Regions:
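ABC family nucleotide-binding domain
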Residues: 1-152
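C-terminal boundary and immediately downstream tail of ABC-type ATPase nucleotide-binding domains
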Residues: 153-174
Protein backbone atom coordinates (compact mmCIF):
# COMPACT_ATOMS: atom_id res chain seq x y z
CA UNK A 1 0.00 0.00 0.00
CA UNK A 2 1.30 3.46 -0.91
CA UNK A 3 2.06 5.82 1.95
CA UNK A 4 0.48 8.97 0.47
CA UNK A 5 1.79 11.51 3.01
CA UNK A 6 5.33 10.23 2.48
CA UNK A 7 4.91 10.26 -1.30
CA UNK A 8 3.50 13.81 -1.24
CA UNK A 9 6.54 15.00 0.68
CA UNK A 10 8.69 14.01 -2.31
CA UNK A 11 6.61 15.84 -4.92
CA UNK A 12 7.40 19.47 -5.75
CA UNK A 13 4.55 21.67 -6.92
CA UNK A 14 4.62 25.00 -8.75
CA UNK A 15 1.38 26.77 -9.60
CA UNK A 16 0.46 29.62 -11.93
CA UNK A 17 0.44 32.01 -8.97
CA UNK A 18 3.72 31.83 -7.11
CA UNK A 19 2.28 32.03 -3.58
CA UNK A 20 5.49 33.35 -2.06
CA UNK A 21 5.19 34.76 1.45
CA UNK A 22 5.12 38.54 0.83
CA UNK A 23 6.43 39.44 4.31
CA UNK A 24 9.51 37.19 4.00
CA UNK A 25 12.66 37.75 2.00
CA UNK A 26 13.40 35.47 -0.93
CA UNK A 27 15.93 33.59 1.20
CA UNK A 28 13.39 33.14 3.99
CA UNK A 29 10.84 31.88 1.45
CA UNK A 30 13.35 29.21 0.43
CA UNK A 31 14.40 28.17 3.93
CA UNK A 32 11.23 28.08 6.03
CA UNK A 33 9.89 24.73 4.76
CA UNK A 34 13.35 23.16 4.78
CA UNK A 35 13.69 24.02 8.47
CA UNK A 36 10.11 23.24 9.56
CA UNK A 37 9.42 20.16 7.43
CA UNK A 38 12.83 18.63 6.71
CA UNK A 39 14.46 19.66 9.99
CA UNK A 40 17.44 21.28 8.33
CA UNK A 41 19.51 23.77 10.32
CA UNK A 42 19.25 27.46 9.40
CA UNK A 43 22.73 27.37 7.85
CA UNK A 44 22.08 24.20 5.86
CA UNK A 45 18.73 25.53 4.60
CA UNK A 46 20.26 28.89 3.71
CA UNK A 47 23.17 27.27 1.83
CA UNK A 48 20.78 25.06 -0.15
CA UNK A 49 18.48 28.01 -0.86
CA UNK A 50 21.30 30.23 -2.10
CA UNK A 51 22.65 27.44 -4.30
CA UNK A 52 19.21 27.03 -5.87
CA UNK A 53 18.79 30.78 -6.31
CA UNK A 54 22.10 30.78 -8.15
CA UNK A 55 20.86 27.90 -10.31
CA UNK A 56 17.78 29.90 -11.38
CA UNK A 57 19.86 33.06 -11.88
CA UNK A 58 18.60 35.01 -8.88
CA UNK A 59 21.26 34.79 -6.17
CA UNK A 60 21.74 38.57 -6.27
CA UNK A 61 18.08 38.99 -5.26
CA UNK A 62 18.22 36.83 -2.11
CA UNK A 63 17.69 39.82 0.21
CA UNK A 64 14.63 41.16 -1.62
CA UNK A 65 10.95 40.65 -0.90
CA UNK A 66 8.67 39.17 -3.59
CA UNK A 67 7.04 42.53 -4.41
CA UNK A 68 10.45 43.83 -5.50
CA UNK A 69 10.72 41.20 -8.24
CA UNK A 70 9.07 40.60 -11.61
CA UNK A 71 6.56 37.82 -12.11
CA UNK A 72 9.11 35.71 -13.99
CA UNK A 73 11.61 36.14 -11.16
CA UNK A 74 9.00 35.21 -8.57
CA UNK A 75 8.08 32.09 -10.53
CA UNK A 76 11.75 31.06 -10.69
CA UNK A 77 11.91 31.53 -6.90
CA UNK A 78 8.84 29.28 -6.61
CA UNK A 79 10.66 26.62 -8.65
CA UNK A 80 13.76 26.97 -6.45
CA UNK A 81 11.56 26.70 -3.34
CA UNK A 82 10.05 23.45 -4.61
CA UNK A 83 13.50 22.07 -5.51
CA UNK A 84 14.78 22.92 -2.02
CA UNK A 85 12.61 20.10 -0.71
CA UNK A 86 14.55 17.51 -2.78
CA UNK A 87 11.57 16.25 -4.80
CA UNK A 88 11.68 13.11 -6.91
CA UNK A 89 9.25 14.71 -9.36
CA UNK A 90 7.71 18.10 -10.05
CA UNK A 91 4.14 19.10 -10.88
CA UNK A 92 3.61 22.35 -12.76
CA UNK A 93 0.16 23.89 -13.20
CA UNK A 94 0.31 26.52 -15.95
CA UNK A 95 3.53 28.01 -14.56
CA UNK A 96 3.69 30.71 -17.24
CA UNK A 97 0.03 31.70 -17.59
CA UNK A 98 0.18 34.56 -15.06
CA UNK A 99 3.34 36.05 -16.59
CA UNK A 100 3.96 38.86 -19.02
CA UNK A 101 4.98 37.41 -22.41
CA UNK A 102 8.53 38.71 -21.99
CA UNK A 103 8.96 36.76 -18.74
CA UNK A 104 7.79 33.38 -20.01
CA UNK A 105 11.15 32.26 -21.39
CA UNK A 106 12.88 32.92 -18.05
CA UNK A 107 10.70 30.24 -16.49
CA UNK A 108 10.67 27.84 -19.44
CA UNK A 109 14.48 27.91 -19.63
CA UNK A 110 14.70 26.70 -16.02
CA UNK A 111 12.14 23.98 -16.71
CA UNK A 112 14.01 22.84 -19.83
CA UNK A 113 17.18 22.55 -17.73
CA UNK A 114 15.32 20.42 -15.17
CA UNK A 115 14.04 18.14 -17.93
CA UNK A 116 17.52 17.80 -19.42
CA UNK A 117 18.85 16.84 -15.99
CA UNK A 118 16.29 14.03 -15.79
CA UNK A 119 13.71 15.51 -13.43
CA UNK A 120 10.37 13.79 -13.86
CA UNK A 121 7.80 16.50 -14.50
CA UNK A 122 4.11 16.66 -15.18
CA UNK A 123 3.16 20.01 -16.64
CA UNK A 124 -0.21 21.47 -17.52
CA UNK A 125 0.59 24.01 -20.22
CA UNK A 126 -0.54 25.77 -23.35
CA UNK A 127 3.11 26.36 -24.31
CA UNK A 128 3.23 23.88 -27.19
CA UNK A 129 6.78 24.75 -28.25
CA UNK A 130 7.95 23.93 -24.74
CA UNK A 131 5.94 20.69 -24.67
CA UNK A 132 7.35 19.69 -28.05
CA UNK A 133 10.88 20.26 -26.73
CA UNK A 134 10.76 18.50 -23.37
CA UNK A 135 7.80 16.10 -23.30
CA UNK A 136 8.13 12.37 -23.66
CA UNK A 137 4.38 11.92 -23.53
CA UNK A 138 1.51 14.31 -24.21
CA UNK A 139 -1.96 13.98 -22.76
CA UNK A 140 -4.32 16.33 -24.59
CA UNK A 141 -7.51 17.21 -22.75
CA UNK A 142 -10.64 19.03 -23.82
CA UNK A 143 -13.53 19.91 -21.49
CA UNK A 144 -11.98 17.82 -18.72
CA UNK A 145 -11.69 14.64 -20.78
CA UNK A 146 -8.60 12.94 -22.17
CA UNK A 147 -8.87 13.19 -25.94
CA UNK A 148 -5.42 11.90 -26.80
CA UNK A 149 -2.54 10.16 -25.00
CA UNK A 150 0.52 9.82 -27.21
CA UNK A 151 4.26 10.22 -27.52
CA UNK A 152 5.26 13.77 -28.39
CA UNK A 153 6.27 12.69 -31.91
CA UNK A 154 2.88 11.09 -32.53
CA UNK A 155 0.94 13.94 -30.97
CA UNK A 156 2.72 16.73 -32.81
CA UNK A 157 3.37 14.77 -36.01
CA UNK A 158 0.18 12.83 -36.54
CA UNK A 159 -2.52 13.51 -33.95
CA UNK A 160 -5.28 10.91 -34.07
CA UNK A 161 -8.26 12.97 -32.92
CA UNK A 162 -9.98 15.71 -34.90
CA UNK A 163 -9.94 17.94 -31.82
CA UNK A 164 -6.14 17.66 -31.39
CA UNK A 165 -5.66 18.32 -35.10
CA UNK A 166 -7.82 21.47 -34.87
CA UNK A 167 -5.99 22.67 -31.76
CA UNK A 168 -2.53 22.16 -33.23
CA UNK A 169 -3.50 23.78 -36.54
CA UNK A 170 -4.51 26.93 -34.64
CA UNK A 171 -1.67 26.97 -32.12
CA UNK A 172 1.33 25.97 -34.23
CA UNK A 173 0.55 28.19 -37.21
CA UNK A 174 0.44 31.57 -35.43
Amino acid sequence: KTNLPKLRSHVGMVFQHFELFPHLTITENLTIAQEKVLGRSKDEARDKGLKLLDRVGLKAHAHKHPAQMSGGQQQRVAIARALAMDPICMLFDEPTSALDPEMINEVLDVMVELAQEGMTMMCVTHEMGFAKTVAHRVIFMDHGLIVEDATKDDFFGKPRSDRAQQFLAKILHH
